[in-house]
């Protein structure tokens, strides 16, 4: 909702095959951030044939939006490259502007979301272990065993892979003598 983009949930084999009873999730604990949702009262009157700038070029890449049917919130939406009002636009300058806007949105997501769980305890580690999904429990168990043996092991658990948090991960990679990627498949 907030970033106006689809979310793809990628469970792994363990999650897909696991059967476990868990308490019902309290949906009231998680507020839904609708993002830049316009209110009808805030929409300026549109003189026909004007449209609301649904795809306005913004600094953070996220445009204000309306709910279909809102007075003065009329916009077009196509699968073609478009201008700020949603009208098809083939001009190279608009294509570049809209593409740049989409990439700014990815940067906004990366800046506002914690892309990985940081279990790094050491400034410099013998080993950095990076995992995702259900590998977490096994990794935490292994890290605890290595701690008892005096091996300095840091652990990062990825939560977001697009946009991939390369800039945020690099300092951890640089501070480790060896990096181990734990995944739950053949590769």
Feature-to-residue mapping (PLM):
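Flexible, low-complexity linker and terminal segments
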Residues: 1-187
């Amino acid at each position: 909702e907030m970033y106006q983009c689809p979310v793809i949930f990628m469970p792994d084999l363990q999650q897909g095959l696991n059967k476990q009873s868990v308490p019902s999730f309290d949906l009231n604990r998680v507020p839904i951030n609708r993002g830049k949702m316009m209110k009808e009262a805030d929409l300026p009157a549109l003189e026909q044939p004007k449209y609301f700038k649904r795809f306005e070029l913004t600094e953070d890449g996220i445009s204000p939006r309306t709910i279909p049917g809102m007075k003065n919130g009329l916009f077009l939406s196509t699968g073609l490259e478009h201008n700020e009002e949603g009208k098809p636009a083939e001009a190279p300058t608009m294509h570049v502007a809209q593409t740049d806007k989409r990439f700014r949105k990815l940067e906004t997501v990366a800046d506002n979301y914690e892309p990985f769980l940081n279990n790094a305890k050491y400034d410099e580690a013998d080993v950095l272990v990076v995992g995702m999904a259900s590998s977490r429990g096994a990794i935490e168990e292994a890290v605890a065993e290595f701690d008892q043996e005096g091996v300095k092991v840091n652990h990062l658990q990825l939560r977001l892979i697009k946009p991939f948090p390369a800039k945020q991960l690099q300092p951890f990679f640089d501070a480790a003598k060896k990096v181990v990627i734990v995944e739950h498949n053949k590769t």
